[in-house]
Amino acid sequence: MARPKSATHDIKRDAILDIAAQCFADRSYPAASMNEIATACGTSKARLYHYYDSKEAILFDLMDRYTQRLLSLIALTDATAQRRNLDDRAALHELIRAFLQEYESSATRHVALLNDTQFLSDAPDEHLGSPVISPRELILNRQRDVVAAVTRALRRAYPGRLNASNQTAITMMLFGMINWTFTWLRPGGPISYVAFA
């Protein structure tokens, strides 16, 4: 019979993810080792393997949680806009503000999502649900869902300006403006994420 998880198991996994995300952002996913992550966590490599069986498992859990968070943020922002009776442009502004606030607190996770999805396995994994999908495809599908949601918000906000031929370019231009803020917009700097939004 398997031993039950301790009450702090999930808290420790969360802490590992925070530290691993920082290691991946600082050194890159390929360069960061399980030994370095364990050292940064103040634990042994063996103890780290108690929580995650591989570096890729850490990366997947990090991206799995983060992409779920982004999708939840979209749903929450949409519900808030409806409850407050915001017009479509104000709702888009709220969505952009919500993304930027999330990016401010999740910069290292965002770096991993932008740079490291390619390192996830493309082998189908039956543990990820039905239909069977690979870890990489699951994360890419969620990224596509985020992009599609923002495209819909843009089309609602600017119905006369967005159409089938330009919506992808305009959506990606918006993401280009906000996705890379972590490279130049610093918390505590002369302009805040909230002011930028």
What do the PLM-derived regions correspond to, one by one?
Residues D26-P30, S106, G160:
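Short coil/turn segments at alpha/beta junctions that flank glycine-rich nucleotide-binding fingerprints
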Residues P4, I11, A15, I19, ...:
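Helix-turn-helix
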Residues D61, A75-T108:
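Hydrophobic alpha-helical connector segments
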Residues A75, A123-P159, T168-M172:
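Amphipathic alpha-helical packing segments from all-alpha helical-bundle domains
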Residues Q101-S105, R109, R152, R156, ...:
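Amphipathic C-terminal alpha-helical segment
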Residues D64-L70:
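Short, basic, alpha-helical segments at the C-terminal edge of helix-turn-helix-like DNA-binding modules
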Residues Y103-S134, T183-W184:
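Amphipathic alpha-helical segments used for helix-helix packing
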Residues H93, A164-F175, V194-A197:
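Short, well-structured alpha-helical segments
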